Amino acid sequence: MWYLLWFVGILLMCSLSTLVLVWLDPRLKS
């Protein structure tokens, strides 16, 4: 069961970091 939480946690971290990069990218370029 723990591996399921680990997998979901990694997916959440990946999606969050992607969202932050997409959100920051236009601000850094302008």
Curated annotation (Swiss-Prot):
It is found in: Cell inner membrane. Keywords: Cell inner membrane, Cell membrane, Membrane, Stress response, Transmembrane, Transmembrane helix. The chain crosses the membrane at residues 4-24. This is Putative cytochrome bd-II ubiquinol oxidase subunit AppX. It comes from Escherichia coli (strain K12). Might be part of cytochrome bd-II oxidase (appB and appC). Able to restore reductant resistance to a cydX deletion mutant upon overexpression. CydX and this protein may have some functional overlap. It holds the Pfam family YbgT_YccB. Belongs to the cytochrome ubiquinol oxidase subunit X family. The keyword Transmembrane applies.
